[in-house]
Amino acid sequence: SYFTILLGKMAFYIVLCMLQFFIMLAAGALLMPILGLDSLQIGHAYGALFLTVLVVAATATAYGVLIGSVFQTPNQALPFGAISIVILSAIGGIWVPVEILPAGLQQLAKLSPLHWALDAINELFLRTGTILTVWKQLIILLFFALIFFLIAGITESRRRR
């Protein structure tokens, strides 16, 4: 089925996303001190960090697959993808901390998967969180990933008929 093909494509990109993340971590931990800056402190919950990165990568990849399924050409998909990520990042608290926004916008932030990803990463890096403190964010991100994946699969299946 097409869902199997989508899963195969997603597996590759999830691994790629995770590699990118861990390369950036290594740069923060190893390269920053060489430049005279403080080393990145990644906390102590390595398993929780790995699982969080896996779930965030799966959600991001599922969103990319959804965009690729909805649009028929890269020229259609690329602008939408870029603009939608900028909007979701603004809504989700990437630009401005959600805590300083009005109550209504704080609720709106919860509609962005980027909000939940940032919250999980901040919990692990800044608040020395564990899997017990990020499980809610990971479940919500998995829900987003599942919805994106199902819509992509249904869209592509209908297109192939």
Per-region residue spans from a language model:
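Alpha-helical transmembrane segments and their short interhelical loops
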Residues: 2, 6-79, 86, 132-136, ...
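Short cytosolic juxtamembrane segments of multi-pass membrane proteins
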Residues: 154-161
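Small-residue-rich segments of transmembrane alpha-helices in multi-pass membrane proteins
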Residues: 85-91
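Central hydrophobic cores of alpha-helical transmembrane segments
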Residues: 80-84, 109-112
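Short secondary-structure boundary segments
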Residues: 129, 153-154
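Membrane-interfacial helix-loop-helix junctions in multi-pass membrane proteins
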Residues: 93-147
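Residue-level detector of alpha-helical segments with a strong bias toward transmembrane helices
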Residues: 18, 102-103, 155
